[in-house]
Amino acid sequence: MDMKTTGDDGYFVEERSAETVIARMRDCDDPRLKEIMAVVTRKLHEAVKEIEPTEEEWMKAIHFLTEVGQICNEWRQEWILFSDILGVSMLVDAINHRKPSGASESTVLGPFHVADAPEMPMGANICLDGKGEDMLVTGRILDTDGVPVAGARIDVWQANDEGFYDVQQKGIQPDFNLRGVFVTGEDGRYWFRAAKPKYYPIPDDGPVGQLLRAMGRHPYRPAHLHYIVSAEGFTTLVTHIFDPDDPYIRSDAVFGVKESLLADFQRVEDAQRAQELGFANGWFWSVDHDFVLAR
């Protein structure tokens, strides 16, 4: 084998730059790390050769990556945000959560899940401050054969009508506002009351936000409800449901929307039913959506 072809001679030549770097990993005793770094090295060198950046452009890229790291802290992960806006987070999620035919699709978890949300009786209202447009959420948890799943744990959370989660507005929203955990009975059905969520921006006051603006992109996520659905014997489902009429439904900043996750948000003009549900405005939003769990 020609050492010049494989890069094993150790000398740097532009035409075989990636091969020279990859050859230095011959003594790596972690095969997975070796595989990953070989692919990353090859693709990065391919990109640099295609782009042919100036030295000034390369230093600008280095400074951007430095700023991304510097803004991270215990509650802010700008690297994840960077991955999100490039669609990489969704791609990793899709690869790791491929579903059998008929099972509900997953999407990214998001940064605002709270592990100790309270378990609530079926039908409870998770909107604790009474603000926003009333909403009734119903549906079933099924297996891929259409059989109801009893004992399914449904962890749900959402932003309020101004686009904020409770953890973003300590002292303004009550703790655990618009969060709750529900457990299905034998019929697999769930229902709860809430407030219609609104679209909101991802954090855009840092380097990732600057990059979005430079690319001519907005920072908004369309209105959605988060779900984690788990049951014994089934794969846990992390997903959302989205309002198809949201202005940002086709341009989610983090690419989290899949067509199967669109739900039907219906405005119900029924004063009697609204009163029965404890809604004071004489009308409400209704959304019915089933989730299908895979084993």
Curated annotation (Swiss-Prot):
It comes from the Bacteria. GO terms for biological process: catechol-containing compound metabolic process. Binds 1 Fe(3+) ion per subunit. Keywords: Dioxygenase, Iron, Metal-binding, Oxidoreductase. Gene3D superfamilies: Aromatic compound dioxygenase. Its EC number is 1.13.11.37. Fe cation binds at residues 165, 200, 224, 226. Its cofactor is Fe(3+). It is an enzyme of class 1 (oxidoreductase). Pathway: Aromatic compound metabolism. The keyword Iron applies. It holds the Pfam family Dioxygenase_N. One of its GO terms (molecular function) is ferric iron binding. InterPro entries: 1_2-HQD/HQD (IPR039390), Catechol_dOase_N (IPR007535), Intradiol_dOase_C (IPR000627), Intradiol_dOase_core (IPR015889), Intradiol_RC_Dioxygenase (IPR050770). PROSITE patterns: INTRADIOL_DIOXYGENAS. It catalyses: benzene-1,2,4-triol + O2 = maleylacetate + 2 H(+). Induction: Induced in the presence of gamma-resorcylate. Involved in the gamma-resorcylate (2,6-dihydroxybenzoate) catabolism. Catalyzes the conversion of hydroxyquinol to malelylacetate. Belongs to the intradiol ring-cleavage dioxygenase family. This is Hydroxyquinol 1,2-dioxygenase. It comes from Rhizobium sp. (strain MTP-10005). The lineage of its organism: Bacteria, Pseudomonadati, Pseudomonadota, Alphaproteobacteria, Hyphomicrobiales.
